[in-house]
Amino acid sequence: FEDWCTSDKLMEMNENFRVNVHRNLQRDSATKPLTENWSCTVVSGQEEGSLPGLFGLSFQQTSNSSSRHFQSPKKINLGPRHNCHNALMAVLAARELGVKFSESMERICEFDSPLPDRYGIEHIGKHVLINDTYNANPDSFASVINDLATNCSYPKNKLLIMGDMLELGQYSETEHAKILEQALRLDGLKAIFLKGEKFQNLIFSTQQKDHESQFDQVYALQETEDFPVALLSDLLDEESVILVKGSRKMNMEQFVDLLRNNLL
């Protein structure tokens, strides 16, 4: 699974991406390793009138003596695309425990949507809101920003409201800097709103480097009430995707309520 887990390839709408999984299984010390080759195709897309996040999964197993094919019976609403990797890992782990592919696929297809505030996607007027306010860490932040950068199911224009990631200890400044740099590289970026001293302390130091021209798009917020609602009509004059994310103690869900009340 190593190549699979470290792959940075992501799917684009109506295109496939293929991952080869090579497994060497040692069954008792007296037997030869059993090698099975797995190929998985993930198809992502958005049906007309629906929200982004619909996927199809297809497995192809090839061994020395046979070849078999399995696929999901219907589209799956997995939310962020990194959940495809999670789903594939779950399917293959279940197989090692004796669960049939057909049963695993049926169970995954029962998955409807993430839990509240965990990458919940909704339409607000003509815009797409991603409510990922339950919590945040460097991996989850990087994943969702990467999703915004590569998933053409979302509108081109992007607005980010980002709160600090807490409990990172000595790595806090480095990890916040990585996320801010990644966010500033997004195409179609309209603005970034930052809540919390960890992100805000980086603004000046980063401003002196590669993104000085972009910092007229970055705003520091002390409280939810500081959000410049009057700017929304200018920033979101076209169809946009809006991400709201931060650690639990940052109370980022308050921004979701603010957007719902002012964008309808």
Regions found by a protein language model. Give the residues of each.
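Long, charge-dense, solvent-exposed interaction surfaces that engage phosphate-rich ligands
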Residues: E2
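A Rossmann-like FAD-binding core segment of flavoenzymes
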Residues: F55
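Active-site "gating" loop of Rossmann-like NAD(P)-dependent oxidoreductase/epimerase domains
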Residues: N20
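ATP-dependent carboxylate-amine ligase
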Residues: C5, K9-F17, S29-S39, Q46-P52, ...
